[in-house]
Amino acid sequence: MEQFHGTTIVSVRRGDKVALGGDGQVTLGNIVMKGGARKVRRIYNNQVLVGFAGGTADAFSLLDRFEAKLEKHQGNLTRAAVELAKDWRTDRMLRRLEAMLITADATTTLVITGNGDVLDPEGGICAIGSGGAYAQAAARALVENTDLSPRDIVEKSLGIAGDMCIYTNHNRIIETIE
């Protein structure tokens, strides 16, 4: 059976502001199943942003586990991410999950992968999902050549990804921490 997948999640950090956004498309194979899914959320008393790409059920499972790790480590984003990645890599059932997360709080942005990687993005820009490369390239160009806010950069980057990637649409949800 095919999995639900396909999305774009992008995050931009500039100064003391961070924005994280995603599109709303969910596909099953080559069929659009839903256009308004919410793949970007606020968790841990609205202090942490999280966006997910990959298999929808897998992503929700990881999101629940990440939230539990945040609670356990009193909101320490880096510690929670490392602990989730360790579990993800060593637990036989978790290893089968196909998803990625971008997480951000007031000071830190991290990408968490199923390979057990916890990555601190270069230049405060990161993107995941099927349209991630398009969104990341657009965001990098906008950061280097404009004074736009992180929110505006994320919005424009998702728009460009939506124009280019068939698994990304223009229904955007963007969250910010300032």
Swiss-Prot record:
<dbReference type="GO" id="GO:0046872">
    <property type="term" value="F:metal ion binding"/>
</dbReference>
<dbReference type="InterPro" id="IPR029055">
    <property type="entry name" value="Ntn_hydrolases_N"/>
</dbReference>
<feature type="binding site">
    <location>
        <position position="168"/>
    </location>
    <ligand>
        <name>Na(+)</name>
    </ligand>
</feature>
<keyword id="KW-0645">Protease</keyword>
<dbReference type="InterPro" id="IPR022281">
    <property type="entry name" value="ATP-dep_Prtase_HsIV_su"/>
</dbReference>
<dbReference type="GO" id="GO:0005839">
    <property type="term" value="C:proteasome core complex"/>
</dbReference>
<keyword id="KW-0479">Metal-binding</keyword>
<dbReference type="Pfam" id="PF00227">
    <property type="entry name" value="Proteasome"/>
</dbReference>
<keyword id="KW-0378">Hydrolase</keyword>
<keyword id="KW-0021">Allosteric enzyme</keyword>
<feature type="binding site">
    <location>
        <position position="165"/>
    </location>
    <ligand>
        <name>Na(+)</name>
    </ligand>
</feature>
<protein>
    <recommendedName>
        <fullName>ATP-dependent protease subunit HslV</fullName>
        <ecNumber>3.4.25.2</ecNumber>
    </recommendedName>
</protein>
<dbReference type="GO" id="GO:0051603">
    <property type="term" value="P:proteolysis involved in protein catabolic process"/>
</dbReference>
<dbReference type="InterPro" id="IPR023333">
    <property type="entry name" value="Proteasome_suB-type"/>
</dbReference>
<keyword id="KW-0963">Cytoplasm</keyword>
<feature type="binding site">
    <location>
        <position position="162"/>
    </location>
    <ligand>
        <name>Na(+)</name>
    </ligand>
</feature>
<dbReference type="InterPro" id="IPR001353">
    <property type="entry name" value="Proteasome_sua/b"/>
</dbReference>
<keyword id="KW-0888">Threonine protease</keyword>
<comment type="function">
    <text>Protease subunit of a proteasome-like degradation complex believed to be a general protein degrading machinery.</text>
</comment>
<comment type="similarity">
    <text>Belongs to the peptidase T1B family. HslV subfamily.</text>
</comment>
<dbReference type="GO" id="GO:0009376">
    <property type="term" value="C:HslUV protease complex"/>
</dbReference>
<feature type="active site">
    <location>
        <position position="7"/>
    </location>
</feature>
<dbReference type="GO" id="GO:0004298">
    <property type="term" value="F:threonine-type endopeptidase activity"/>
</dbReference>
<keyword id="KW-0915">Sodium</keyword>
<comment type="subunit">
    <text>A double ring-shaped homohexamer of HslV is capped on each side by a ring-shaped HslU homohexamer. The assembly of the HslU/HslV complex is dependent on binding of ATP.</text>
</comment>
